[in-house]
Amino acid sequence: MLVELNEDNAKKAVESLGDGTAFAIANVTDEDSVTDCIKATIEKFGGIHIVVNCAGIGSASKTVGKDGAHPLQYFKTVVDINLIGTFNVLRLAAVEMGNNEPGEDGECGVIVNTASVAAFDGQIGQAGYSASKAGVVGMTLPIARDLARMGIRVNTIAPGIFDTPMMAMASDQVRSPLIEMTQFPKRLGLPQEYASLVKHIVENTFLNGETIRL
């Protein structure tokens, strides 16, 4: 089940993925919206075994800029979606995962969150974004410990500079220095490289409570 806010984008993605996929429209910050999405997923696929939290936004603004103090609403919105939205989805999904028939090692589900290297190496103007992603990193281990009794693993991926729609909106003047900062290879990460790590996390049943920089 692909969860999106934009219906047109969701339809295009499902069409490209082919059979065995569906989409639901939901706002990750809204409890009722996420609950409805989870119900739709269970009705369509019979249960929830894997959740990958990818919803996120960025907002570049210095703490004090030429127009004054950082707009507080920008900060709140980024934290609301990136951090609180992630927690909202995983907490509600975990309830349903707990109803699954345990598999190998008693596992009932896997949750993969998305942070960012900005959680560790935030740049100028990234206070809100870095704080939100650091929050995702910080809650990974405690939540993994919380959900261990239910047979649910929780891990987080902290991607570097990836070829995403958010990055596509940036100018070459912004993108080029970021690419130059990477060690090797000096290019943007690819979506399939992120997906490959998600697949490994799901398949490696001994991996839990960890944040992996990619």
Name each region found by the language model.
Residues S116:
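Residue(s) in the substrate-gating loop at a strand-loop-helix junction
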Residues T35, G58-K76, V95, N99-D105, ...:
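Conserved mid-core segment of classical short-chain dehydrogenase/reductases
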Residues V95, R145-D146:
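Alpha-helical segment proximal to the catalytic Tyr-Lys
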Residues L190-L214:
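C-terminal substrate-recognition "lid" of short-chain dehydrogenase/reductases
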